[in-house]
């Protein structure tokens, strides 16, 4: 018996391994795999259905068809195990060996492996230093190649045509060898001596001068080095023996009706065997050369088709005209082995059904239909029935269950109690799409889902379906309960805000009960406590919305954590007081003593979680939901057409707008405005009008006049059903109500431009035919967009997951001093994101001091900033904090807990092993479908605002200038002459309240540090023109002004004033080519003046289309406008918005016309122009010059004599992220990416924490480029994983040798995923063939560090609970005990860093 058990065990064992290596298979290796040679193309005998001997399904080679039974039936049963039948040659063993035993085909002539030939760059070509075309001509028998020149003048690897070959044979007889076909290539590859070739190339690379040659040599050196290191031989890229896949992996299945379904591979193998056998015969018969050659070529083609059909020439098709699936097709693409069977598998013990709402469930429960539960938990029920003695065998138990006896249901109840199930809704865009619940048995066939988790699943009840899975093992159940339970997923991992938030009906009910109305029954009554009030309400003494006074008892917690009771009488309403009854102890009544809109409810749940913890919050959320439903039912809110009130002012406002449009039309016809300006102005007018009508409508709907208790008529918020729904955040938005009751507004054409005639009607009035067609235009575009968006968004998520999948938290502290400096984000003067939101949950990198006081730090280094710390920082008026960031983390693989900071979904420091990469990818990808696909024209979008032309202060305080260069005008105002200047407004504590960018040429009405009042105008400028300002006083001198050539004189009809416009380059003709019109400022005697602080003369180059209003010789003062450039033209640039913009940023694509940044700091001057380019020179402090040639059509935004700093924009445009990295470094790049990506999401109202974007940026910066190889083995210009260079340099420094120098490189997410160290992960992402070819040549070893690789090889992932398993495996193989291991892994904090946090629950370190 013992032997029998051992026998079963030895077949179950799996290999334990730490890495996977891939390489080229030598012919000897292929033969060692083989269990016999396949000699015939036959598959099975059509009469007996038994495999043919020596055929593709031969039992003698591949093993028996039935377990322990030979083919002829002589040996049966297990007792003959291992016997080889002498009659049919089959070994008696398990049939499943037919899945693992390989065969082989001995090829009559060598054949090139198509992957190493055609997968670019061609490895065979690189190895032989021949072009792919030449090698193909040799392989496919079109040319000879010299393999051994002997003493003849021919050269090795020289190609000869048929004629040249015959001529050479006549001249030199047998002194040389030249052949064609794969034999020739095989010979050439076999002759290569890798070591000496390597030495020769290394010598050559030093002396070579040409750039292209250098590239080619570097590639060859890398390739040959790879061959030497991996132990591969070049001639193995040519096949002399072909392996045959085990037959059960290319099955032949009988269908009913006597036909067979077969795998395409069998057809492909059959062709190879047929041609190979035919070739053998021809060679035996020594047939004419031309026939043999043709047969060899056909053999080569059939092997090509088997390995990768369609890679060369036309794909071989089967009977039904579709290309046959070759071995390469089996592994690549969505249906390939990687993505279909290894990364995504079907799961047993699962069910799916429609979902319905379960308003009486608790948060941790879901309703499971009885039938479904019985099917899912069948094995458990069988076992219990047997254990109870209700059934003797499994069969009997099965009968009981099928009859659905009464006791079965009782046992099912017991089985499912405390056994969580996992619910999943597709598409699973983030980890909240799979959560665990405790099942409750229900009648019917639909699954009941708790309403509060709908947001997380993005589920609604209009026919959505969900899948149920049963965690079977104890560990799985434990993880489902501890980590995946819906009650543990209250906060969203994307932004740390509650995701379990009531919506729709619940919000409506809570909002309805918390509204206060004037003059309701019982107003002014005073109650001793809430229960007294409840009695009064139940007896209809007071109404729900009446304003009353109630005594509330609260429990307060002081700083030391002591709790005390406090009573206070509050002004509130009946509804709010009733709501306070469900408040958990410890939450202040203030939180519900307000209108419970969706925002406030979210804030309430958030406060509850932070103050009271998880358990109380879950119970509270449930109570809120029940209450909300109850009062929504009582409210009985419904909408009807009378709720859509059209404002009386609408007619009047429309009349005014139409009048304005007419005026502009007249101006256009008399030529005062251009077509573009007219369009922009009309769109502007209608946008403004729409806003005005919408505001009037919201005022009409949202307020009503009522009589209060004193008999006065007052305004109060109305109880209009439509308004209630929008105001509470339950359903609908002002945008939608505006279309129902105000006006539909401007519509968008499919290309994103705006139709200038708006829809003046609303849906209540109804649209006219023309209006209806205008509106269908935009609506159809919307639907088409949605379909595209879903696919694009899914693909973005896939790329993001792929690039970050191997990033986990690996240690507590990497000990780095680096970090990013965080400041509030200000746009258009408003603080869009205050500092507190940006630093919350981050770890401080440097001590933070009070502004202007460097003695006592407020917050010390390595403190995790939680809500209390952030409040302290805000109180102190701190404006910038340096925090640790994943980008600057120095952990070798992964990130450390302190650089990452708080786990947003849990609210404490992140645990060891958390897969922060995948979380980041999901958080960014999940809202992808909410983003638009639009490109915006800055002409004004359907929601455009009018152009800004001044800065008006919103808060009182003092003014502070930063980076601002200005000159003082004669009249005392200041004129800005810098581009990056900013004005901030500080409050009394020195905290920045507003910040504005100042354009060049703006007039500033205040001095630095002056006091300002709110509403005061600080600065103004002309939004439609870009001025050129003189920095010195003197007289104007025109240079190169030639009438009719470089300038066009224009006289204004109305005013009679003349101005000169600089002519466009195209209009100048030949004599104006080299003229450069400029204005120079001179003194009385006509000598050039210089710009203060430089030795450059004060002259201003005038770009085309600029307008000069001065006359030659006119006096100018400091700060006067010399010329102005109309802004109209440069503004039509499209802004890519939405999803495409996010994808462009993550792919690190260069914009079309990128901004040109200053390569160094210095003073600007202009040199001689070339044909289509302008020459701009930057002269730095030590006098060296840098030249930049800029196309004439680009707008240079700097002037002669201006001082620029390195990395500043000198030519307008979108900056390229690569330039920012190169000139400014990693921190500004990170800031740029975070800002740009956040702008897109913020526009859609999506909140994502910065750290997710930083995590992805870290992965984009994984590689570095070697600038100077030093004594390392890297090559100049090579891109290497940063960690490899750091390790290599450490070794070099230890040996006192020169380390390699390198620069960081920014890779797009697709490139970064393919350039990962793991070839398994890269191959399963994209370009499978290329990745595997490259890896095989290099003999790459995959250390299985990431998540994907481990899923593919079928192990636990090295993240979360799997991380302990992996570290235990690693240490037990070295022979360490558990306790030794824990000291190594770092239960203690490493590098002596303490993590401090003032919250009452301490942070669990190390998980």
UniProtKB/Swiss-Prot annotation:
<dbReference type="InterPro" id="IPR007083">
    <property type="entry name" value="RNA_pol_Rpb1_4"/>
</dbReference>
<keyword id="KW-0479">Metal-binding</keyword>
<dbReference type="InterPro" id="IPR042102">
    <property type="entry name" value="RNA_pol_Rpb1_3_sf"/>
</dbReference>
<keyword id="KW-0240">DNA-directed RNA polymerase</keyword>
<keyword id="KW-0862">Zinc</keyword>
<feature type="binding site">
    <location>
        <position position="464"/>
    </location>
    <ligand>
        <name>Mg(2+)</name>
    </ligand>
</feature>
<dbReference type="InterPro" id="IPR000722">
    <property type="entry name" value="RNA_pol_asu"/>
</dbReference>
<feature type="binding site">
    <location>
        <position position="462"/>
    </location>
    <ligand>
        <name>Mg(2+)</name>
    </ligand>
</feature>
<dbReference type="Pfam" id="PF00623">
    <property type="entry name" value="RNA_pol_Rpb1_2"/>
</dbReference>
<dbReference type="InterPro" id="IPR012754">
    <property type="entry name" value="DNA-dir_RpoC_beta_prime_bact"/>
</dbReference>
<dbReference type="InterPro" id="IPR045867">
    <property type="entry name" value="DNA-dir_RpoC_beta_prime"/>
</dbReference>
<feature type="compositionally biased region" description="Polar residues">
    <location>
        <begin position="1384"/>
        <end position="1399"/>
    </location>
</feature>
<keyword id="KW-0548">Nucleotidyltransferase</keyword>
<feature type="binding site">
    <location>
        <position position="899"/>
    </location>
    <ligand>
        <name>Zn(2+) 2</name>
    </ligand>
</feature>
<dbReference type="GO" id="GO:0003899">
    <property type="term" value="F:DNA-directed RNA polymerase activity"/>
</dbReference>
<keyword id="KW-0808">Transferase</keyword>
<dbReference type="Pfam" id="PF04998">
    <property type="entry name" value="RNA_pol_Rpb1_5"/>
</dbReference>
<keyword id="KW-0460">Magnesium</keyword>
<feature type="binding site">
    <location>
        <position position="460"/>
    </location>
    <ligand>
        <name>Mg(2+)</name>
    </ligand>
</feature>
<feature type="binding site">
    <location>
        <position position="814"/>
    </location>
    <ligand>
        <name>Zn(2+) 2</name>
    </ligand>
</feature>
<dbReference type="GO" id="GO:0008270">
    <property type="term" value="F:zinc ion binding"/>
</dbReference>
<dbReference type="InterPro" id="IPR007066">
    <property type="entry name" value="RNA_pol_Rpb1_3"/>
</dbReference>
<feature type="binding site">
    <location>
        <position position="889"/>
    </location>
    <ligand>
        <name>Zn(2+) 2</name>
    </ligand>
</feature>
<feature type="binding site">
    <location>
        <position position="85"/>
    </location>
    <ligand>
        <name>Zn(2+) 1</name>
    </ligand>
</feature>
<feature type="binding site">
    <location>
        <position position="896"/>
    </location>
    <ligand>
        <name>Zn(2+) 2</name>
    </ligand>
</feature>
<feature type="binding site">
    <location>
        <position position="70"/>
    </location>
    <ligand>
        <name>Zn(2+) 1</name>
    </ligand>
</feature>
<feature type="binding site">
    <location>
        <position position="72"/>
    </location>
    <ligand>
        <name>Zn(2+) 1</name>
    </ligand>
</feature>
<feature type="binding site">
    <location>
        <position position="88"/>
    </location>
    <ligand>
        <name>Zn(2+) 1</name>
    </ligand>
</feature>
<dbReference type="InterPro" id="IPR006592">
    <property type="entry name" value="RNA_pol_N"/>
</dbReference>
<dbReference type="Pfam" id="PF04983">
    <property type="entry name" value="RNA_pol_Rpb1_3"/>
</dbReference>
<feature type="region of interest" description="Disordered">
    <location>
        <begin position="1384"/>
        <end position="1407"/>
    </location>
</feature>
<comment type="similarity">
    <text>Belongs to the RNA polymerase beta' chain family.</text>
</comment>
<dbReference type="GO" id="GO:0000287">
    <property type="term" value="F:magnesium ion binding"/>
</dbReference>
<dbReference type="InterPro" id="IPR007081">
    <property type="entry name" value="RNA_pol_Rpb1_5"/>
</dbReference>
<dbReference type="Pfam" id="PF04997">
    <property type="entry name" value="RNA_pol_Rpb1_1"/>
</dbReference>
<dbReference type="GO" id="GO:0006351">
    <property type="term" value="P:DNA-templated transcription"/>
</dbReference>
<dbReference type="GO" id="GO:0003677">
    <property type="term" value="F:DNA binding"/>
</dbReference>
<comment type="function">
    <text>DNA-dependent RNA polymerase catalyzes the transcription of DNA into RNA using the four ribonucleoside triphosphates as substrates.</text>
</comment>
<dbReference type="InterPro" id="IPR038120">
    <property type="entry name" value="Rpb1_funnel_sf"/>
</dbReference>
<dbReference type="InterPro" id="IPR044893">
    <property type="entry name" value="RNA_pol_Rpb1_clamp_domain"/>
</dbReference>
<keyword id="KW-0804">Transcription</keyword>
<dbReference type="GO" id="GO:0000428">
    <property type="term" value="C:DNA-directed RNA polymerase complex"/>
</dbReference>
């Amino acid at each position: 018996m013992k032997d029998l058990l051992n026998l079963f065990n030895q077949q179950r064992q799996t290999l334990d391994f730490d890495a996977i290596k891939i390489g080229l298979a030598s012919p000897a290796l292929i033969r060692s795999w083989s269990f016999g040679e396949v000699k015939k193309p036959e598959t099975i005998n059509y009469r007996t259905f038994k495999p043919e001997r020596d055929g593709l399904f031969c039992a003698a080679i591949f093993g028996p068809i039935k377990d322990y039974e030979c083919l002829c039936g002589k040996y049966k049963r297990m007792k003959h195990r291992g016997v080889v039948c002498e009659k049919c040659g089959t070994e008696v063993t398990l049939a499943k060996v037919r899945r693992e035993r390989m065969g082989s085909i001995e090829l009559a002539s060598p054949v090139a492996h198509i992957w190493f030939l055609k997968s670019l760059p061609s490895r065979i070509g690189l190895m032989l230093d021949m072009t792919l075309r030449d090698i193909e001509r040799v392989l496919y028998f079109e040319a000879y190649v010299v393999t051994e020149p002997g003493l003849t003048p021919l050269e090795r690897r020289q190609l000869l045509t048929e004629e040249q070959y015959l001529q050479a044979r006549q001249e030199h007889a047998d002194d040389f060898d030249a052949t064609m076909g794969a034999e020739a290539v095989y010979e050439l590859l076999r002759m290569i001596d890798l070591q000496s070739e390597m030495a020769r190339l290394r010598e050559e690379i030093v002396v070579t001068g040409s750039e292209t040659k250098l590239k080619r040599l570097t590639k060859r050196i890398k390739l040959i080095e790879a061959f030497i290191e991996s132990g591969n031989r070049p001639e193995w890229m040519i096949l002399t023996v072909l392996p045959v896949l085990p037959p059960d992996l290319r099955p032949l299945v009988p269908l009913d009706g006597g036909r067979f379904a077969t795998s395409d591979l069998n057809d492909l193998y059959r062709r190879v065997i047929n041609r190979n056998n035919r070739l053998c015969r021809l060679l035996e018969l020594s047939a004419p050369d031309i026939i043999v050659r043709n047969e060899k070529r056909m053999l080569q083609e059939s092997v090509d088709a088997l390995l990768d059909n369609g890679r060369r020439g036309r794909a071989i098709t089967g009977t039904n005209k579709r290309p046959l699936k070759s071995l390469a097709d089996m592994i690549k693409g969505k249906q390939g082995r990687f993505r279909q069977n290894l990364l995504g598998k079907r799961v047993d013990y699962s069910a799916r059904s429609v979902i319905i709402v379960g308003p009486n469930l608790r948060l941790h429960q879901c309703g499971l239909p009885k039938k479904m539960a019985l099917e899912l938990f069948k094995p458990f029920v069988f076992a219990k029935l047997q254990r109870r003695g209700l059934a003797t065998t499994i069969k009997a138990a099965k009968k009981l269950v099928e009859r659905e006896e009464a006791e079965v249901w009782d046992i099912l109840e017991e089985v499912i109690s405390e056994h969580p199930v996992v619910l999943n809704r597709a598409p699973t865009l983030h980890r909240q799409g799979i959560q665990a619940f405790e099942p409750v048995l229900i009648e019917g066939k639909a699954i009941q889902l708790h309403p509060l988790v709908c947001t997380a699943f993005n589920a609604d009840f209009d026919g959505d379906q969900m899948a149920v899975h049963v965690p079977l093992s104890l560990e799985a159940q434990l993880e489902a309960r501890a980590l995946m339970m819906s009650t543990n997923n209250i906060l969203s991992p994307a932004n740390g805000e509650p995701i379990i938030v009531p919506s729709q009906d619940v919000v409506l009910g809570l909002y309805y009960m918390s509204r206060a109305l004037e003059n309701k029954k019982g107003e002014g009554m005073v109650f001793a406590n809430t229960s007294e009030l409840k009695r009064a309400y139940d007896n209809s003494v007071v109404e729900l919305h009446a304003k009353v006074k109630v005594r509330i008892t609260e429990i307060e917690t002081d700083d030391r954590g002591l709790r005390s009771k406090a009573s206070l009488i509050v002004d509130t309403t009946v509804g709010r007081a009733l709501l306070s009854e469900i408040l958990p102890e410890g939450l202040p009544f203030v939180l519900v003593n307000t209108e419970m809109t969706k925002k406030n409810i979210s804030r309430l749940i958030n406060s509850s979680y932070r103050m009271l913890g998880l358990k109380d919050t879950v119970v509270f959320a449930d109570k809120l939901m029940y209450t909300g439903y109850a009062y929504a039912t009582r409210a009985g809110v419904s909408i009807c057409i009378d709720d859509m009130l059209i404002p009386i002012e609408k007619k009047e406002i429309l009349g005014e707008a139409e009048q304005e449009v007419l005026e502009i039309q007249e101006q256009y016809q008399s030529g005062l405005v251009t077509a573009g300006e007219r369009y922009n102005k009309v769109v502007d007018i209608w946008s403004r009008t729409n806003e005005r009508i919408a505001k009037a409508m919201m005022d009409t709907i949202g307020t009503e006049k009522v009589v209060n208790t004193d008999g006065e008529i007052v305004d109060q918020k109305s109880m209009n059903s439509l308004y209630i729904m929008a105001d509470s955040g339950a359903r609908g938005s002002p945008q939608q109500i505006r279309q129902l009751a105000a006006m539909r507004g401007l519509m968008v054409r499919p290309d994103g431009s705006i139709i200038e005639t708006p829809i003046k009607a609303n849906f209540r009035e109804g649209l006219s035919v023309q209006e209806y067609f205008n509106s269908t235009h935009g609506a159809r575009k919307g639907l088409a967009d949605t379909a595209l968006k879903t696919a694009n968004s899914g693909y973005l998520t896939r790329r993001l997951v792929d690039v970050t999948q191997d990033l986990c938290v690996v240690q507590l502290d990497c000990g780095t001093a680096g970090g990013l400096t965080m400041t509030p984000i200000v746009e258009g003067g408003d603080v869009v994101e205050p500092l507190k939101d940006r630093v919350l949950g981050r770890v401080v990198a440097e001590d933070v001091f009070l502004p202007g006081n460097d003695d006592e730090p407020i917050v010390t280094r390595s403190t995790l900033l939680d809500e209390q710390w952030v409040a302290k920082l805000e109180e102190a008026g701190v404006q910038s904090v340096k925090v640790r960031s994943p980008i600057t983390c120095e952990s070798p693989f992964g990130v450390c807990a302190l650089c990452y900071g708080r786990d947003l979904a849990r609210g404490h420091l992140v645990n060891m092993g958390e897969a922060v990469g995948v979380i980041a990818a999901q958080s960014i990808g999940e809202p992808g479908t909410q983003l638009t696909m639009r490109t915006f024209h800055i002409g004004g979008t359907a929601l455009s605002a009018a152009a800004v032309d001044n800065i008006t202060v919103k808060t009182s305080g003092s003014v502070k200038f930063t980076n601002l260069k200005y000159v003082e005008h004669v009249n005392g105002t200041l004129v800005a002459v810098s581009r990056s200047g900013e004005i901030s407004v500080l409050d009394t504590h020195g905290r920045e309240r507003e910040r504005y960018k100042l354009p060049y040429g703006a007039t500033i009405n205040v001095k630095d540090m002056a006091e300002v009042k709110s509403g005061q105008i600080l600065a103004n400028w002309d939004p439609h023109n870009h001025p050129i300002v003189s920095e010195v006083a003197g007289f104007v001198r025109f240079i190169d002004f030639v009438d009719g050539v470089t300038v066009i004189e224009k006289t204004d009809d109305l005013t009679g004033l003349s101005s000169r416009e600089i002519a466009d380059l195209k209009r100048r003709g030949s004599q104006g080519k080299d003229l450069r019109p400029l204005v120079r400022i001179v003194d009385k005697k006509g000598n050039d003046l210089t710009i203060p602080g430089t030795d450059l003369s004060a002259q201003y180059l005038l770009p085309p289309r600029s307008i000069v209003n001065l006359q030659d010789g006119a006096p100018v003062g400091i700060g006067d406008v010399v010329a102005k450039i109309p802004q109209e033209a440069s503004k039509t640039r499209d802004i890519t918005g939405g999803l495409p913009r996010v994808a462009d940023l993550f792919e690190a694509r260069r914009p079309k016309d990128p901004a040109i940044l200053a390569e160094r700091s210095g003073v600007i001057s202009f040199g001689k122009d070339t044909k289509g380019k302008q020459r701009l020179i930057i002269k730095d402090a030590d006098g060296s010059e840098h030249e930049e040639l800029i196309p004439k059509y680009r707008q240079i935004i700097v002037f002669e004599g201006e001082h620029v700093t390195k990395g500043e924009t000198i030519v307008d445009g979108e900056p390229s992220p690569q330039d920012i990295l190169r000139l400014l470094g990693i921190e500004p790049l990170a800031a740029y990416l975070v800002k740009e990506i956040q702008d897109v999401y913020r526009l859609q109202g999506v909140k994502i924490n910065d750290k997710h974007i930083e995590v992805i940026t870290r992965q984009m910066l994984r590689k570095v480029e070697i600038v100077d190889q030093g004594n390392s083995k890297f090559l100049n210009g090579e891109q290497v994983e940063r960690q490899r260079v750091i390790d290599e340099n450490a070794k070099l420094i230890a040996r006192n040798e020169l380390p390699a120098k390198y620069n960081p490189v920014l890779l797009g997410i697709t490139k970064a995923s393919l350039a990962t160290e793991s070839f398994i992960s890269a191959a399963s992402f994209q370009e499978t063939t290329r990745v595997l070819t490259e890896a095989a040549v290099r003999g790459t070893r995959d250390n299985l560090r990431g998540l994907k690789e481990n899923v593919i090889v079928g192990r636990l992932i090295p993240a979360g609970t799997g991380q302990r398993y992996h570290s235990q495996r690693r240490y037990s193989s070295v022979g360490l005990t558990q306790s030794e291991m824990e000291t190594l892994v770092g239960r203690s904090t490493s590098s002596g860093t303490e993590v401090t946090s003032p919250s009452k629950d301490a942070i669990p370190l190390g998980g």
